[in-house]
Amino acid sequence: MKHLLLAGLAALGFTSAATAQTGTLERVKARGELICGNHIALPGFGIQGPDGRWDGLDIDLCRAIASAIFNDPNKVKFVPTTPQMRFVVVQSGEVDMLARNATYTMSRDTSAGMSWPIINYFDGQGFMVRKSLGVTEAKGLEGASICVTQGTTTELNLADFFRANKLKYEIIGFATNEEGVKALEAGRCDAFTTDTSGLAAERLKFSKPDDFVVLPTLISREPLGPAVKRGDESWVALVKWVHYAMLNAEEFGVTKANVDEQLKSGNPEIKRLLGVEGKFGEGLGLTNDWAYRVIKHIGNYGESFERNVGMGSKLQLKRGLNDLASRGGLQYPHPIR
């Protein structure tokens, strides 16, 4: 009996170890699709169209990773998440990654059981008000009622700003951005606050968007990016290098339209990027043409930015900090070699 018990415990230990060693990529491959947590409805970043298709900058990142793994950008299951549940689904393993314009902070990095591979959008928190209010900058909101989404860094930044500037205000909390924006439109509060990219997106939903203005004041730094469950460094690396590949492609002028032609390029950096030379897919558990797949299906970072949130979109946001480092931005393409 003792020997049977020991054998059973050993087998159980072996099974647990095997399960622990089964990485995210292996589970994704076995399942046949990537599960990606995303925003419920944020134009430019994650929103579902009338035809049921999801689009946005964060959505493109999920599709890019699916392209790298499966050579098919549609092998993604999207799971819309609220601000209160977005990190829970990562920690529980319900999703393989979260791409939902979430802010990378110290506490989230050190105590939330998650890793943040990259920043795919550098932002800052601001305010949106009715033009008729006559306010031109944030300090003019003394005594104002502010709508904000509860359980977010946005709510904390709001309190910090008014306390630091010794201003009085009334906070009106909501479970989602959508509820807060509707309250602003209905006149239940004087201002709504979130990341400026989100303000630009939410403004588009108003029946009379020209009646509202986003104030120029930024009250915080908001590095936004995807999050994954901590403990699988290989998966962190895969997410990271898919983003870097899209940045490299933009740096070298490789686009969705010319990627096939670029396979003939004599530039050694482009050869490595597209898998013509070297075996840079092996370390990621991918084929060596993984980056070619990403660019062929999704395009480079600049293309994704422009069609979703840039001047080619309804949001018409400037690149700013999200431009390449070679043009004064913070998006720095790491070398593939």
Task: List where the protein language model places each region.
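Extracytoplasmic small-molecule ligand-binding "clamshell" domains
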Residues: 22-99, 286, 301, 324, ...
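C-terminal functional modules
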Residues: 280-337
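Sec-exported extracytoplasmic/periplasmic mature domains
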Residues: 29-30, 66-74, 91-95, 103, ...
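Bilobed "Venus flytrap"/periplasmic-binding protein-like clamshell domains
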Residues: 35-44, 54-69, 103, 123-179
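Extended ligand-binding regions for polar small-molecule ligands
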Residues: 60-63, 67-69, 131-135, 139, ...
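Acidic, polar ligand-binding/catalytic clefts
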Residues: 63, 67, 71-140, 197-218, ...
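Sec/Tat signal peptide C-region and signal peptidase I cleavage site
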Residues: 16-20
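Bacterial N-terminal signal peptides
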Residues: 6-13
